Swiss-Prot record:
One Pfam short name: BATS
A biological-process GO annotation: biotin biosynthetic process
EC number(s) stated in the UniProt entry for this protein: 2.8.1.6
Record organism: Shewanella oneidensis (strain ATCC 700550 / JCM 31522 / CIP 106686 / LMG 19005 / NCIMB 14063 / MR-1)
Keywords: 2Fe-2S, 4Fe-4S, Biotin biosynthesis, Iron, Iron-sulfur, Metal-binding, S-adenosyl-L-methionine, Transferase
Cofactor: binding details: Binds 1 [4Fe-4S] cluster. The cluster is coordinated with 3 cysteines and an exchangeable S-adenosyl-L-methionine. Binds 1 [2Fe-2S] cluster. The cluster is coordinated with 3 cysteines and 1 arginine.
Binding residue positions for [4Fe-4S] cluster: 56, 60, 63
Domain of life: Bacteria
Protein name: Biotin synthase
């Protein structure tokens, strides 16, 4: 039985001291903790789909979906149910156990909720875990999604409280914490992490992890993203982060949150196989699978499976649904096409 101690009282200087450890010592500590709770050769696989793209009113300086920046991204309306389910079935066939759906909104409108809840129910009927990232949620909206059966809700803190104002001004850090509180209170599992390589200092990376680790309950899933620099965004010309600092961030996240899934998230397309292997050793045990994460590139499935074979890793097995269940879900989705005028409004409009 695991003897790991889970803490929620980490001090900044303690975390900075972990970051400052010699790399071999840090990796040994992180990997030892990882083995206490998880099979080190098993990786949970998620697929992320943008169900509504672009025209977001927020000013996140890293994001190509903001309406404030000219990135050449074409806005798209909320996807039809059948399209979402086709993508979900493809993800499951490729080995994903969780299907994540993201919408470029500040927050979902009440008129969106019935359709979003139905989307959750139909994807779950395929035998997959479900996750959504839709922006800020009210307590009522969180409860609605939980009642519909949504397993996870993603809402990242992005960076430390001190650096946050240099990244985004259209919502506060407390707004983000409030959404996480609503999600946890609803009974859903929390997915929350951040982005590194945004020009922050090492103390900010420590500060981000401090905020996550000192939540009343650790996030169930902690995605750590490397900034993907997109032309047209304010962060397009930032200097690259030292890849070893990314590995350190993964390792410290594993130490601080020993029971959480640590997800090697955006930026893998620009990472070497050797860097990813170090991240898996440091405690990363989840990835996004598929050639695109919302609007940014990601390694091809065949590349990931090739890397898994070389490293002796295997995908975590998820729940299964029968063929009859899947066919019933697709039949129900087709029926939604008859309601297009009522439900497929232009959700990309500001």
């Amino acid at each position: 039985m695991s003897q790991l101690q889970v803490r929620h009282d980490w001090k900044r200087e303690e975390i900075e001291a972990l970051f400052a450890l010699p790399m071999n010592d840090l990796l040994f500590k992180a990997h030892s903790i990882h083995r206490e709770e998880y099979d080190p050769n098993e990786v949970q696989i998620s697929r992320l789909l943008s169900i509504k793209t672009g025209a977001c009113p927020e000013d996140c300086k890293y994001c190509p979906q903001s309406a404030r920046y000219d990135t050449g991204l074409e806005k798209e309306r909320l996807l039809a149910m059948e399209t979402v389910l086709t993508e979900a079935r493809s993800a499951k066939a490729a080995g994903a156990s969780r299907f994540c759906m993201g919408a470029a909104w500040r927050n979902p409108k009440d008129k969106d909720m019935p359709y979003l809840k139905q989307m959750v129910q139909e994807v779950k009927a395929l035998g997959m875990e479900t996750c959504m990232t839709l922006g800020m949620l009210s307590a009522e909206q969180a409860n609605e999604l939980a009642e519909a059966g949504l397993d996870y809700y993603n809402h990242n803190l992005d960076t430390s409280p001190e650096y946050y104002g240099d990244v985004i001004t259209t919502r506060t850090y407390q707004n983000r914490l409030d959404t996480l509180s609503h999600v946890r209170a609803s009974g859903m599992k929390v997915c929350s992490g951040g982005i590194v390589g945004m020009g922050e200092k090492a103390t900010d990376r420590a500060g981000l992890l401090q905020q996550l680790a000192n939540l009343p309950q650790h996030p169930d899933s902690v995605p750590i993203n490397m900034l993907v620099k997109v032309a047209g965004t304010p962060f397009e010309k930032l200097d690259d982060l030292d890849p070893l600092e990314f590995v350190r961030t993964i390792a410290v996240a594993r130490i601080l949150m020993p029971l959480s899934r640590v997800r090697l998230s955006a930026g893998r397309e620009n990472m070497s196989d050797e860097l990813q292997a170090m991240c898996f050793f440091a405690g990363a045990n989840s990835i996004f699978y598929g050639c695109k994460l919302l609007t940014t590139p990601n390694p091809e499935e065949s590349d990931d499976m090739g890397l898994f074979r070389r490293l002796g890793l295997r995908p975590e097995q998820g729940a299964a649904a029968s063929i009859d269940d899947e066919q019933a879900v697709l039949a129900k989705a087709a029926a939604y096409q008859d309601k297009a005028s009522a439900q497929f409004y232009d959700a990309a409009a500001l």
